[in-house]
Each structure stands twice: as C-alpha cells, then as structure tokens.
Amino acid sequence: MFIICIVLLMSCNSHKEKELTIFYVCGTIESHRHIECTKLDSICKTIEYDDTIYVNAVAFKQIEDGIRDVKPVKNSPNSYNSVMYVNAGDMNLCLNGIDNRCWVKQTGGQYHPSVISNKTAYLLKWKSHYYNFLPHDVLVLDKEIRQYGIPYDYRENQVEKPVKKKEVSKVLLKIRM
C-alpha cells in the first residue's frame, strides 16, 4: 500500500517539461531577400526536428523571461528580414538576423513589430547553434556578438564540396536536468 501511495504522489507531481521550438535559416541571407514570419511559421510546421539541445535552467529561464518581456514598437519598417522563428508555448515570434527587432504573433495571426532584449536575442542565437552557421567574417557584424562576444563553443560549420549546404534547421531547446 505504501508503494502505491508513493507512485500516486509522484505521478501527481509530474509536470510537463519546458521546451522551446527554434527554427532558423542557416547562414547569411541576402539583404534584398525578405522572409516574412508567416513563411517561417508555415515551413516550421512542416519539417521535423534536426536536434534536441539541452541548456542549463538559468539560461533557459533567461530566454523564457526575455521572450515574455518583449516590447512592442510603433515606428518599424513593414519590410523585414526574419531569420528565426521561436515557439514558446503560447507565444510565437520571429527574430531579425542582425539585431534585436522581432515580430510577435497576435491573436488574429498577424505579426506586430517588437523589440527583444539584446541578451535574449544573443541567447536564442547562441543556444540554438544559429551562430555556428555564420562564417566568422559575418558573425562579427552581429549586434549581440559585438556586445557579448563570440560564444566559447562557436564552431563554424564548414561544408565540404560537393555536399549541399544546409538551408534551415529546427531544434528543440530543453532544460538539462
């Protein structure tokens, strides 16, 4: 009887593991080619995960809190170049490739311009391995890299000829237990 009670108590305390889906375009994108959030959103829904990445609870919480603290902006250009789509439970957003501008999905499905903290943008790009798909000469142009530095685990993904370069990546970010 005692064992049954323990099993029941443990099952009542089980909780859903926190996770984020991060989908991004690999490498540099031509500035004249605009990718809208709705496009990233629809592609993300059709492909499988490439990897599951585990991060420590502190980094995960910083990312989660930063996503919740996104600030709407009024004067933002209509054309944008989103390179990353993030699903954090009930919140979806797209992130610009060169700075901290983002677009948050509203109830009607429209994306509205916002700003995410530099730290959160940096953590999203770093922990999802987005930076690994940028050559060093492009990496150093990133606003967050200039502020926080190149991540200690940065490894530029070199593609050998004639292998086709990876175009997109979808990762699941989870808390390391």
Positions of predicted regions on the chain:
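Sec-dependent signal peptide recognition
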Residues: 1-5
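C-terminal motif of bacterial Sec signal peptides marking the signal peptidase cleavage site
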Residues: 9-11
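Function-determining sites in protein domains
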Residues: 13-177
